Amino acid sequence: MMIAVIPARGGSKRLPKKNILPFAGSPLICHTIALARSLPAIDRVCVSTDDDETARIAREAGAEIVVRPPELATDRSTTASAVGHALLKLAESGPRADVVITLQPNCPLRTAAIVTDAIDLYRREKPDSVMSVTKSQHKLGPIENGRFLPAYRPGMRSQEMPEQYFENGVVYVARADMVTATEDLFGRAIAPLIIDPLYALGDIDTLLDFQVAEFLFTKYVERFVLPTGLAAKGAA
C-alpha cells in the first residue's frame, strides 16, 4: 500500500493562505493533488490540514482529508510529525501503508516522471528513504563574527568545486513504519534523486517565489499534470 500525504498547514506567515491561492488557474494545492491522483502506483491521496477552507478545496479535488490537531500545526511542528499522524489516522479506515510519499503543496514544479522516478528508485535500492536533490551552483560559507568564511578556496572556479547538492523539497519517499515510529522522514540510508534545477525553483515561501514559480509553470505547462473539474472552478 502506497499513500501520498500532502501536508498543508493553514498558518503560513510570509504568504498567508499560500496553499490555496490561485496558481495558473487553480488553487495551488490542487496541482499536487492532481499529480498524485494521476499516478497508478499511489493507492490513496491524503491532505493533512488544520484549515477548513483548505480541507474543502482538497476534498473537492479528490483527496482524503486528515484533520491535523493544533499541536501539530504550530510554527515549530515538523512535517514528519504531521505525516506520521496522517498515516495512523488513515490506518483506521484501510490497510496500513508500506510506503509514504510526501508531496509538499508549495512545490508545484513537479512532474509525474519525477515522482515515478523517486518511487522506482525506492523500489530498486530499498533505502530508508528517497529525497529529491539538485546540484548546487553556489559558493557557500557561513558568516561568523561579521566575517564571511568561504567553504572553498577563494578564487576557485565553479567547475573546480566539489559537487554538492541541496534538498529541494519536491518529493520524498519513505518507509511508512519508520515515519510513524520515529517521526523521521529520512532515516540513515537516504537515496538521492537528482533533478533538474528548473524544478527546484518552485519552492514557494514568499510572494516573489510564487510569481517566479507561476511564470515557469505557465512557460512549461505541457510538462505538468493540470487540475480539472471542481478544483479548477474553485480558483475563479
Predicted regions located by residue number:
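Hydrophobic helical membrane-anchoring modules
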Residues: 194, 199-236
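Short, high-confidence coil segments that cap the C-terminus of an alpha-helix
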Residues: 42, 95-97, 126-127, 220
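Short phosphate-binding loop-to-helix
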Residues: 52-101, 110-113, 117
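Conserved core of the sugar-phosphate nucleotidyltransferase
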Residues: 81, 85, 99, 108-196
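Histidine-centered beta-alpha loop that forms part of the nucleotide-sugar donor binding/catalytic region
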Residues: 9, 70, 104, 134-135
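N-terminal glycine-rich phosphate-binding loop and ensuing alpha1 helix
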Residues: 2-48
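Short beta-strand scaffold positions
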Residues: 47-49, 173, 204
